[in-house]
Structure formats: C-alpha cells, structure tokens
Curated annotation (Swiss-Prot):
The gene is rpl11. The keyword Ribonucleoprotein applies. One of its GO terms (biological process) is translation. SMART domains: RL11. This is Large ribosomal subunit protein uL11.
Length: 170
C-alpha cells in the first residue's frame, strides 16, 4: 500500500481550503472540503495556534489519517498568557505572567517532543522559552525561577504532577 505523507503547519480550528493544501489534496484525489472539515475538528482544541499536522494518504484506496502534533512551546505559553505574539524586547517589555503550575502543565503536554527525562528539567526548559518571549512566571524573571527550581523550592509542587508526567508516553 503506497502511502504519501503531507506535513503542514495549520492554524488550529481555522484551516482554509486554499493553496498550498488544496492543490496537494486534489492531486491525491481527496475531497478537499471533507479533509479541511476534519482538520478543523482535529485541531479545534488548539484554536489560534500554529499546529503541526501530518496527513497519511493511501494512494490506492484514498483513505487518509490525520495526525495532530503539539504546538510549539512558544505558542502554548502565549496562549496561556492570553497574548498573541512574543515581546519584541523580552529583556525590557514583559507581555504576560503565568503561574508555575501553568508552566508545569505545558511541560507535561510537551513531554512527547522533549529530550529531557525529568519533569524538573522540562519545566526549566519551558522557563527558558518564557524568558525569551517576555513572559514572567510567578511575577518573577523566569531565570530566577530556574534557580529556585534547582534549589528545590518547588519540589512539593513538582511532586504533585510527577504521576501525570510519568503517565505521558514519550
């Protein structure tokens, strides 16, 4: 069964039946409207975010499967902070603030794409991204929180999410 993979970035819940997607789907003999509808349904929980999607198409039967990836860490942090774009000057202009708990939940969501093995390391990675886009955490510079996480100040909070972290497949 010869399969073709189409890898694209789409706006969650807002895929349009235009180029470059439509011509590619048409060439493979797929109903563009139907695929777009299913893409919008599959990505609706990531509304407004860029989401990586893979469409696996069986060239013989025209059956297809949609695999939705996880949005970028930046996109998840921005959505959680309620802003649409990163700060152009993250050192001086802060665009939002998150709780450490929100950052932990994003780390858990991103686990399948991370190379880190521990929740603590994943959270520190998320904090690095938060710093680079101008988002504070617990009303502090994320760099300060990285130090506090390393010192064990948030071990109790991290322990609360350890089971959830361990349940996520890599």
């Amino acid at each position: 069964m010869p399969t073709k993979s189409i890898k694209i970035m789409v706006e969650g819940g807002n895929v349009k039946p235009g180029p470059p997607l439509a011509p590619t789907l048409s060439q493979l003999g797929l109903n563009v409207g139907e695929v777009v509808k299913k893409l919008n349904e599959a990505t609706s929980s990531f509304k407004g975010m860029s989401v990586p999607v893979t469409i696996e198409v069986d060239s013989n039967t025209k059956k297809y499967e949609i695999k939705v990836g996880i949005p970028t860490t930046t996109a998840l942090l921005l959505k959680e902070a309620g802003v649409s774009e990163p700060s152009g000057d993250p050192a001086h202009k802060k665009i939002g603030n998150l709780s450490l708990e929100q950052v932990i939940k994003i780390a858990i969501m991103k686990k399948p794409g991370l190379t880190t093995k521990s929740l603590k390391a994943a959270v520190k990675s998320m904090l690095g991204t938060a710093k680079s886009i101008g988002v504070t955490v617990e009303n502090k510079d994320p760099k300060e929180l990285v130090k506090e996480v390393e010192e064990g100040k948030y071990d109790d909070l991290l322990a609360k999410y350890e089971n959830e972290w361990n349940e996520v497949k890599e």
